[in-house]
Amino acid sequence: MTYIVALTGGIGSGKSTVADEFAKLGTTIVDADIIARQVVEPGKPALDAIRLRFGDAVLNADGSLNRSALRQRIFSSPEEKQWLNNLLHPLIHQETQAQFRAISTPYILWVVPLLVENGLQQRAQRILVVDVDRKTQLERTLARDGISLQQAENILAVQATREQRLACADDIIDNSRCPNALAQQVAELHRHYLELAASAADRMAKNE
């Protein structure tokens, strides 16, 4: 089985930027957010179920999912959020495992924004946390998403805390520094993960 490194971090921490740096070095990326979008594409059973549950108000004019409208519907309703999670999480897990099985590179970088919140730590051999302070998170989120400060703070309030993420980390990337510093951190971790993956493969071969 391919060695799995889970990459996580709060909103605005720069997970995609870090993943892009790993991809430049030849690392295979499996992104939970991309898979989550794929399972609700038009024509997929999950989107039909969502439409039946919430009505046409959560669809765009072209029939695709209006993610913003859906977020508004479930944000203040734990029951509806749980229903949606029960629908989507098994589908996301199934597709994730299918992608894992199809990959033959030494290790996979599995990008999972809600790794800690969903208790998925045990599904990876290594956990990498992208870390920035709260002020930086808010500044980046406001600049990127065009939302209000209150909306950004509401998102942070329902995510794992910085301390909770760091407590799960095997490795930490400080993404508050310059791009060159980030590239250097990624290159060092990439070499380390190749070594860990090789060691894990050797142990598995000896046990067969």
From Swiss-Prot:
Keyword Glycoprotein: no
GO cellular component assignments: cytoplasm
EC number: 2.7.1.24
Binding site for ATP: 12-17
Subcellular location as annotated: Cytoplasm
Catalytic activity: 3'-dephospho-CoA + ATP = ADP + CoA + H(+)
InterPro entries: Depp_CoAkinase, P-loop_NTPase
DPCK domain mapped to chain residues: 4-200
Pfam family, one: CoaE
Gene Ontology terms: biological process: coenzyme A biosynthetic process
Pathway this chain belongs to: Cofactor biosynthesis; coenzyme A biosynthesis; CoA from (R)-pantothenate: step 5/5
Top-level class of the enzyme under EC nomenclature: transferase
Keyword terms, alphabetized: ATP-binding, Coenzyme A biosynthesis, Cytoplasm, Kinase, Nucleotide-binding, Transferase
Primary localization class, coarse: cytoplasm
UniProt-recorded Gene Ontology molecular function terms: ATP binding; dephospho-CoA kinase activity
Biological function: Catalyzes the phosphorylation of the 3'-hydroxyl group of dephosphocoenzyme A to form coenzyme A.
Family the UniProt entry places it in: Belongs to the CoaE family.
Protein's UniProt name: Dephospho-CoA kinase
Organism per entry: Pectobacterium atrosepticum (strain SCRI 1043 / ATCC BAA-672)
